[in-house]
Amino acid sequence: MAPRASALSRFPLAKSIAKCFPGHLKRRTNRKPEIVSEELCDHALQRLSPYLLRNRPLDILDLWPGAGLWSSKINRLLQPRRHVLVEPELQNFRPLLDPLAQSHPSYKLLSMDVFSIGDWKPVLTEHFPEQGPDNGDHTGVLPKNDTLLVLANLPATTSDKDHFTAGRWWQMFMETCMQQTGLHSYGAIRLLASLPSPESQAIIPRYVVDRRRVSLWTENVALHTFEVAAPQDEKFWVNHKGFNVAIDNAARVAERAAEKNISTPPGREFQPLLPAPESPDPGRKPVPYTPRIRTALHDRFCEDIQALDNMDKSTPGYAEAKKKRSRAQTRLNRDNRQAYFLQQMVDQSREIDAQYDALSRAAADPNTTSADFKPILDKISALRSSITDEGQENYHDHLKQFPHIHDSYRTSLRSNNNFDDALLAWDRRPFEPLLIHPEELYPQGIDRSIVYFEPNPNSPVIEKINSLDPSQRGDAFRLFETLSLSLGRGRESLSVAEVLQLIFPGRSTNDIVKSIPSLAEYAAKTPKPDFDSFPKTIHGGSTDPVTSFQENLDYDLSDVRVHILSTSTIWDICIEYQRSGVSVSSVQLNRLFGGTLTSYKTGVHREMVKKRLH
């Protein structure tokens, strides 16, 4: 394939941006590459128009507009009443933004440090006089305001010591959305952001182990969160998610797009997921071929294996090529063998989950006796033994992937093997993101993605929080903050049982599940020794025994990791903690979970914000 032209040679706007940053200032543009391709803007807005063309009149708050191409395209599509451009580096972008601001009376051009704004209410009052309490739609539990749209072209940090990343700004946006403060003072608003791709993948994680703080806060209030456009990535995350899950999920996304008649413009398609090659010689211990993501290492194996096919035995280097082929086949076979046993362990773990579901339903059957559980319990025991045996066939690095892939299956396909009810927004995406080519951003070489967020007026999390008196929500919020912080790097294996022991000392798991029935669906279950003496009733909001508390069962959450819990269940834990009357400060809670707090979380960013817990 011929190399694509550079941004400077293809797009006049790239040259104009370069002129805005002469000499030593050019390095500063690396913080925030600008969209220079009109076609990318047009394709992205074609995708977004059903979400953006909602109602008029509409106001737009446009943060870090930079070169202004994206801003001008959105203005033309939405025809806003007011479009306020806030560019912190206006001294550099003025040659591009001044003509834009003068091109239509809806524009107003300002310069201020966006990150330092602690209270947005005065900004709304001064520059958006039509915004007020009457703009809010209060028909849902979370009031929404479709008359204000925020565009944010978030910069990257300039230093590893800078804690205030684009993701942190996004997280604050979600927190204030929950609290109905700041930009959400008159109702929850929509956000269309461009930001560094790693930050986008933190907001919309591809696999459950990457589900951390910013994604949890987003899930609390999101109706829609999806990538509109993104650069090509190497898809290493597929190794953690599971190749089969990723393939099946992509197929379901294609079905969703077809159902909505959504097509992808030519050249905007992502490369499909390719499986690793099969070995031409399966070796002395053959196992069935197991699909996994193809990598550059597999390509090298193929080259070494195929190189010998074109060589005569008398050719110099034949002996060395033969050794390379043998090594490549051995490594390819070993890679397949590890993948095979890993998949076997995952499949058996999924079967154990299914057996626990069957056990729950049997325990609710009036005709079941304790003797009826023996086949189920025997099968669970046999499956566990098999997992232990197959675990011995795997290297340590592969074994570490086992709980990750099992959890990915649990969160993607737990509900009736249906991706539409999956935990992660990535699994529920309405379409694949459009492909951003490197030269469509200037400067090149820094990946950025475009993400759309829309709040959910019927958020189940907000409904749960509303069950508490406003004066009694502080401890619940503090625990949620601490739990979300604890899911940082190194704490992927944090179990629900560990958390419950820390915040509910002295309480049994059964007692806690009785108070929080939503935990039941995740737990391992066994019939109580005196099962026959207990009633078969189920407790909780569900009629399905799997998701309800049953007095005749014992529950175990020691093998359940926190990152697979829905935010709704996490908030059930937080609300039970609030009601328990045990009040601990954020710092004390954080110490319980072995974490550390940055100045960001100790409240520096909130000094000017009066927090309203909805």
What function would you assign to each model-found segment?
Residues D281, A296, R300-A319, N394-D397, ...:
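Internal anion-binding site segments
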Residues A2-N466:
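Catalytic cores of RNA-modifying enzymes
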Residues M1-R81, G474-R478, R489-A497, T509, ...:
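S-adenosyl-L-methionine
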Residues L223-A230, R507, A523-A524, L597-K601:
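Short amphipathic alpha-helical patches
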Residues R612-H614:
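A positional/structural detector of protein chain ends, strongest at the extreme C-terminus
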Residues M172, V208-R212, Q501-P505, P517-E521, ...:
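Amphipathic alpha-helical scaffolding segments
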